[in-house]
Amino acid sequence: MPRVKRGVTARARHKKVLKLAKGYYGARSRTYRVAVQAVTKAGQYAYRDRRQKKRQFRQLWIARINAASRQNGLSYSRFINGLKKASIEIDRKILADIAVFDKVVFATLVEKAKEALTK
C-alpha cells in the first residue's frame, strides 16, 4: 500500500472551514484551529436558534394579540376562548397581523368573541 500524503485534502478542508468562517472577528477568520471551533459553535447556535425562533415568534404574536384585544376590552385568554366558541379558526400569526394592520376587522372579531362568551 503506497504512502498517502495529506497536502491536497488537508488544504481543501482548511479552505472549506476558513470559507465558512469568513467575516468572523480576528483569528476566528484567519487561523484554522480557532476557525474550526468558531464554525462548530456557530452551527450549534444555528441549530438551537432555528427551534427557538418558532417559540419566540409565537410569543410575539400572543403579545400583540393580547395588547390589541385588551384595547377592545377583552383579555387574550377570554378572546381566544370566545373565538373557539364562535367557531372562528384563525391562527395566531394571522390574528397578530390583523391586530397590527387592520384594527377595524380585529375589533369585529373581538365583538364576535364577546357575543360567543355571553351565550
Curated annotation (Swiss-Prot):
Keyword Ribonucleoprotein: yes
Domain of life: Bacteria
Pfam families assigned: Ribosomal_L20
Biological role: Binds directly to 23S ribosomal RNA and is necessary for the in vitro assembly process of the 50S ribosomal subunit. It is not involved in the protein synthesizing functions of that subunit.
Name the UniProt record assigns to this protein: Large ribosomal subunit protein bL20
Signal peptide residue numbers: none
Keyword Ribosomal protein found: yes
A GO biological-process term: ribosomal large subunit assembly
Keywords for the protein's UniProt record, in alphabetical order: Ribonucleoprotein, Ribosomal protein, RNA-binding, rRNA-binding
Naturally occurring in which organism (per UniProt): Shewanella frigidimarina (strain NCIMB 400)
Similarity comment: Belongs to the bacterial ribosomal protein bL20 family.
Gene expressing this chain: rplT
One example GO MF annotation: structural constituent of ribosome
An example Gene Ontology CC term for this record: ribonucleoprotein complex
